């Protein structure tokens, strides 16, 4: 006679072992998530478009907006390398560029010119050759270039004529090279006539301050509203040439807008449009 089932044996109970499996499942999911996050962290998101920004102090103010716009798509990784005093004719630029290119960017976003104006205006042809040399070095590392023009300047600075000469050089560079694309920053930061403005309609559809105020006077540097508009301009250009989807909603209101650079000098981005 076969022994009967021991009803006191847990293994003999209906569904025995299922609860143990159900207990392990969440742990497996968590472990896989950790492995995936470690992979992304160590590879830096190898499938994302590698972008670097370079330029002067105006570009420095624009960098957080460019980074926010591009990274909000999940398809780009942005290294921001702009700082005050950068120019093609300034000491140390070649070493600065080599260091940036050593990281293998696929796209280089450039915005500069203010520190080059004296030499540029004095000898535009020589500056054009310098532009070609710099573009050759970027292309030689496999990068394409988005060259942003100098934004409209406050009339008080008295550099508008020189700015036009500089932007003419950047336009000409893009015209003779397939690996360089020129972007008109006046479209993003200018008023209705493309000239300087302190305020304009921002990405949220309301009027925002786009340029700083310094000592009560208009200044050429950017506020978060201007940086966001610049980021949107760059994103639009990249999406024309790369498979990049839509950014997350209202990325222009994220934490980057509280960066300390937008309160330098204090209150510079707190002007009222009234």
Describe these PLM feature segments:
Residues 154-274:
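Catalytic His-Asp segment of secreted/periplasmic serine-dependent ester chemistry enzymes
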Residues 1-19:
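N-terminal Lys/Arg-rich, disordered targeting/topogenic segments
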Residues 35-49, 64, 242-245:
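C-terminal region of N-terminal signal peptides and the immediate post-cleavage residues
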Residues 124-133, 162-167:
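Charged helix-capping and loop-helix junction motifs
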Residues 47-129, 256-273:
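Conserved SGNH/GDSL esterase-like catalytic core that processes O-acyl groups on lipids
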